[in-house]
Design a protein with these regions (language model features):
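Domain-level detector for long C-terminal conserved domains
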Residues: 2-8, 142-298
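Conserved SAM-binding motif I beta-strand of class I
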Residues: 134-139
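Active-site catalytic pocket residues across diverse enzymes, especially alpha/beta-hydrolases
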Residues: 77, 81, 112-116, 152, ...
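Class I SAM-dependent methyltransferase Rossmann-like catalytic core
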Residues: 44-86
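N-terminal auxiliary segments of SAM/dcSAM-dependent transferases
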Residues: 1-41
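Phosphate/oxyanion-binding active-site loops and adjacent basic polyanion-contact surfaces
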Residues: 59-74, 100-108, 140-148, 212-215
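Conserved SAM-binding loop of SAM-dependent methyltransferases across substrates and taxa
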Residues: 101-123
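Conserved class I S-adenosyl-L-methionine
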Residues: 90-100
Length: 298
């Protein structure tokens, strides 16, 4: 895995430095939006959809934004030897906390498909080798979990003609909110193996408000113990929560970065097609951080 490969994969996903949904993902998104009713919803309902109409607005306003920010944040990791060491074993496990309609899971899956295409063209990927992906979707909203499952299965149906290397494993939904669901997450980890990527996309603020700051931090520590030694934990939060981001950064002992993602807006909403978004990101290796913390405590 080298810088040239990373540039090739990034150019495919982010041509000319602009992150875009590819045609299959646009098709899946349009289909889901078309099947949902249109009615007036509040801003909070749009951000945290609990019924079909608010899910429709979330898909229009936030899906592409969050999806492309996930890809922007993970592009370097998926072209590392650490990630290759995971996928060459034929199994990837994604824990998607605050999954919404499986936004992070879909973004990671599409990146993996793109990566393997480039590995095949370079003669690096073994012929006939497959990667099974298991998804653990965690959200308290039934409409989010149901929509996420439909979009994941729709992605595999569309991509099956050109993609034989990435196959759908299990989709497990966990309805109980984080961190009260840690016993469930531990049982899933025991049955499937350690999580390779754990994502927390735009959930720090609601989790801190609902469960309390200390419980959120302790939950993040507990998730680290469930993760693969070559895996990553990814946390994203919007630029308006700087105070919360820095508190969590100090509490878990990990620095955050302030990222820019230049994206194509989709579906188009009568605005400029291309827009820059700024957000906070944590991306870290859980096992190394645990070792550092344990050594410090000792």
């Amino acid at each position: 895995m080298n810088r040239t490969l990373q540039n090739q994969v990034k150019e495919n996903l982010c041509p000319d430095g602009i992150w875009r949904l590819n045609d299959p993902m646009k098709s899946i998104l349009r289909r889901q939006i078309s099947h949902l009713p249109k009615s007036k919803v509040t801003e909070d309902e749009t951000r945290y959809p609990g019924r079909p109409a608010s899910m429709r607005e979330f898909l229009i306003k936030f899906f592409a934004r969050h999806y492309l920010q996930i890809q922007n944040s993970l592009i370097e990791y998926i072209t590392t030897q650490d990630f290759y060491n995971i996928i060459r074993l034929g199994h990837l496990r994604i824990l998607d906390v605050g999954s919404g309609p499986a936004v992070a899971s879909l973004a990671i899956t599409d990146m993996l498909v793109c990566l393997i295409e480039h590995l095949k063209s370079e003669g690096i990927w073994p012929r006939g080798k497959r990667v099974k992906i298991d998804y653990i979707l965690n959200d308290t909203s039934g409409i989010c979990l149901g929509t996420g499952k439909r979009m994941l299965t729709g992605y595999y149906k569309i991509s099956r003609r050109n993609n034989r290397e990435v196959v759908l494993g299990q989709i497990i939904d966990v309805r109980r909110g984080f961190p009260d669901n840690l016993n469930q997450l531990q049982r899933v980890r025991f049955n499937l193996g350690k999580y390779d990527i754990a994502t927390f996309s735009y959930v720090l603020s609601p989790l801190s408000e609902e469960k309390g700051f200390n419980n959120l931090v302790l939950g993040l520590f507990d998730v680290e113990k469930l993760c693969n030694y070559s895996g990553r934990i990814l946390v994203l939060q919007d630029k308006y929560r700087a105070g919360l981001v820095y508190r969590i950064s100090r509490a878990i002992g990990i620095s955050n970065t302030f990222e820019e993602s230049i994206q194509e807006i989709y579906p188009k909403r009568g605005l400029c097609d291309i827009y820059p978004y700024w957000y906070y990101c944590f991306l870290y290796i859980p096992t190394k951080k645990m070792m550092v913390r344990q050594n410090f405590v000792a």
